[in-house]
Amino acid sequence: MNVAELKSRLQSSPDHSVSILLPDGDRVPRHFHVTEVGHVAKKFVDCGGTFRSSETCVLQALVGSDDHHRLTAGRLAHILELAKPILPMTDLPVEIEYEEGVISQFPLQEIIAEGASLTLQLGLKHTDCLAKDKCGMESGCCSDGESGEDEGGACCGDAGEGQGCCK
């Protein structure tokens, strides 16, 4: 879900409460705060040598000690409006950053209307090799071929010299 879609849904139900449903089915305690809205730009090179970039809008959720606090959809829409100067476009995908033992970022998959509440359903992010065609991961070179166990990291060889990964 992107910023424009999120704002539209929030603005259409400004008096609704907002809750967050984690991918494992647990809920973030209802007295959470959104303490940051960030524009995160990531520039990187994959293991095959291709330069890439990605951008997201990250909302940081923090559970405070004030357990009577409840965030409304209208208030969250207002917070997103305040962030407009730092968000270069409204089609940025939205992620929620939340700490429960470790800080994790979860993509916002959908918003579910439940009575007078909007539930932000979060998904999972996964790692992947972006240069499978260059490093040989499609052929399973990073597994031992029998158990499927990983023998090393993704693309640990020089793909430019035709060695593929883990060779």
Predicted segment positions?
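Small/polar-rich, solvent-exposed N-terminal microdomains that initiate assembly or binding
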Residues: K7-E36
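Short, solvent-exposed beta-alpha or beta-beta edge segments that form flexible loop/patches at the rim
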Residues: V28-T50
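Short connector loops at helix/strand junctions that flank enzyme active sites
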Residues: P29-H31, R52-T56, M89-D91
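Oligomerization/assembly interface segments of phage tail-like spikes and tubes
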Residues: S53-S65, L122-L124
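Short, conserved charged micro-motifs
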Residues: D67-A73
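Short amphipathic alpha-helices in soluble, non-transmembrane regions
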Residues: A73-I79
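Helix-rich interaction surfaces within compact, conserved domain-sized segments
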Residues: L82-K134
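Cysteine-cluster motifs in flexible loop/terminal segments that predominantly coordinate metals
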Residues: H126-K167
